[in-house]
């Protein structure tokens, strides 16, 4: 099982940060690996919401379907892949702090095949990339660009 954590503090209210992160269609605006992202189920975002994400990982284009498995507004957002190269779970927690929001992201996966062989490299590269993307989100949100 591959697992890593990244975090940042964003100088915006927790409601704003949660709204941006929980809407998968915002991912390509701040994540360098997300090429496309769209909600595939109707209605507001909540438990059971589905989405399709096209990403580029280690130079490979990958398409995955995700489902929201936990949804606590302004507190926690969990999604799990339902298709794609390997099972993946993304847990994001939100903590209101003075002057902003603390965002913690945990990514867990069970790589198989090529990805299993490259697991140490994938974890290292993915952690660095995820932290960079979270820092980009911070910059965009603090500049009111998102």
Please give the residue ranges for each predicted region:
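Residue-level preference for beta-strand/loop junctions
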Residues: 2, 45-49, 60, 86, ...
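Beta-strand elements of well-folded, non-transmembrane domains
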Residues: 12, 57-59, 109-113
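A short, structured loop/turn motif at beta-sheet edges
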Residues: 14-15, 45, 69-74, 93-102
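Short, charged/polar surface micro-motifs in flexible loops or helix N-caps
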Residues: 58-61, 70-76
């Amino acid at each position: 099982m591959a697992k890593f954590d990244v975090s940042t503090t964003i100088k915006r209210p927790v409601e704003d940060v949660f709204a941006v992160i929980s809407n998968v269609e915002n991912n390509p605006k701040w994540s360098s690996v997300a090429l496309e992202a769209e909600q595939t189920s109707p209605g507001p975002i909540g438990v059971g919401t589905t989405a399709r994400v096209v990403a580029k990982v280690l130079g490979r284009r990958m398409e995955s379907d995700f489902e929201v498995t936990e949804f606590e507004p302004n507190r926690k957002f969990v999604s799990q892949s339902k298709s794609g190269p390997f099972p993946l779970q993304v847990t994001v927690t939100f903590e209101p702090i003075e002057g902003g929001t603390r965002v913690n992201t945990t990514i867990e996966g069970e790589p198989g095949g090529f990805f299993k062989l490259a697991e140490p490299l994938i974890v290292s590269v993915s952690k660095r990339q995820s932290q960079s993307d979270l820092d980009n989100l911070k910059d965009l949100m603090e500049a009111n660009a998102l």
